[in-house]
């Protein structure tokens, strides 16, 4: 998918999220292969969606955007893979390995009141201290001091 089509899809996804969440939508971050410029024909579009008042359980959160995801599959043949989190899920005490992966390449699609930018500024010293490393064989991030 070329950059123009990706931008159109991301803009449409943003508009649908604004309709769905209203004022509860905080940020949408593109990450993964499309953000890093390494996407191939069947790559999915990885998105971190930060919103308030989400269901508590992860399985229930997945259902929140299911209709929108299916619509993009049918209309464009593209799989959007949103991960929904609440602002409180982004702790300063422990960094989720997902965040380490996102930091390898991301693009801010929407960031109300600079929530994501401010979060990144606050976690910089933590990231430097914990020194996350990617374990290729396991395809996951680990904290250097713990391995």
UniProtKB/Swiss-Prot annotation:
GSX(10)DXD motif (motif): residue ranges: 32-46
Single annotated GO MF: nucleotidyltransferase activity
SUPFAM superfamilies reported for this sequence: Nucleotidyltransferase
Enzyme Commission identifier(s): 2.7.7.108
Transmembrane segments annotated in the record for this chain: none
Superkingdom as given in the UniProt entry: Archaea
Protein name in UniProt: Putative protein adenylyltransferase MJ1305
Species name: Methanocaldococcus jannaschii (strain ATCC 43067 / DSM 2661 / JAL-1 / JCM 10045 / NBRC 100440) (Methanococcus jannaschii)
């Amino acid at each position: 998918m070329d950059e123009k089509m990706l931008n159109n899809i991301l803009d449409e996804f943003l508009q649908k999220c604004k309709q769905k969440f209203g004022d509860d939508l905080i940020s949408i971050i593109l990450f993964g292969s499309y953000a890093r410029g390494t996407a191939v024909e069947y790559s999915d579009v990885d998105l971190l969606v930060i919103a308030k008042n989400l269901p508590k359980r992860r399985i229930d959160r997945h259902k929140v955007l299911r209709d929108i995801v299916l619509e993009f599959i049918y209309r464009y043949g593209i799989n959007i893979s949103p991960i929904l989190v609440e602002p409180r899920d982004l702790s300063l005490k422990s960094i989720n390995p997902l965040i380490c992966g996102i930091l390898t390449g991301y693009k801010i699609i929407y960031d109300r009141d600079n929530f994501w930018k401010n979060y990144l500024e606050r976690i910089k010293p933590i990231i430097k201290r914990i020194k996350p490393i990617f374990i290729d064989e396991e395809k996951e991030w680990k904290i250097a001091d713990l391995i």
